[in-house]
Each structure stands twice: as structure tokens, then as C-alpha cells.
């Protein structure tokens, strides 16, 4: 939950996608494919279902729609923070910090979708230009063609470009 945006299956998918792209091995089994709202893995819903009850609510029946709000259980925040500090390896904590930096400025659902979609295209076509990326976004879905303004795509492309050397094989 950030800047008025709710936690959701959609947001969890985008964060898991970027953690995987940043090299998080515990997410290596998630298979992301190009779907209506960008890269998506059905496995993320299973992870959320496993966390349901103690860390969040809204995934009781695993029927939450992509943008349906999930409620984070803030009473567990201290436990989660302690887990991150004591149980994650330093490189995993570094990935979390990089995820925060990478998504800074892209926290709305639309901007997360744009960032992840542009990255997915760049991953699939490593030498793709900005112009070709804009064109591919336009053929992904009619919704993306209408919603993703050229400037939004360029902003995401340039943002990802800044991280290309720091993130390694992410881009």
C-alpha cells in the first residue's frame, strides 16, 4: 500500500516479477507471461494465498480479481521487519533495496504496469529501440495502445536504461 494505492494481486505480480528479474532465486519457479496487464504469473496468487490470514487478507478463496484490494496486516509488520533483518541474506536485502529504488516514481498501478511491460519487451527483445518498444506496446493489447502514452513508455524505457549497468542481466 503506497500513495493511496491498494495492495492487490496485480501489484504483487509486478513486484514479484521485478524481484525475479533482479535475480531473486526464491522466485525462479514463477513463470511470467505476457498477459493483459503486463507480465503475469498465476503462481503469485498461490504465494499470496499462503500468506493469507497472518500477513494479509483477501485471498481466502484465491478468487481475488487483479485490482481487488488486499488488506495488509500491519500487526505483523514488526515480525516481517525482523525476518528481513535476520533471515534474509545480505544479497536478498540488497535486492529489496534495489526493488524500492527501481520502482520509485512508478508506484501507481498504471505506472507499474507500464514499467513492467516495457521491461518485459526489452527482456524478450534485448536490442529493441525505444521506437520499436512503443510499437510493440501498441500491438500487445488495445487497452495498452490507448492508455500507454508514448511519453509514458519513453519515461519507463529511459528509467530502465539507467539501471541496465547496475542491475546486471535484468535488462
Predicted segments with their positions:
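Domain-edge interaction signal
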Residues: 1-171
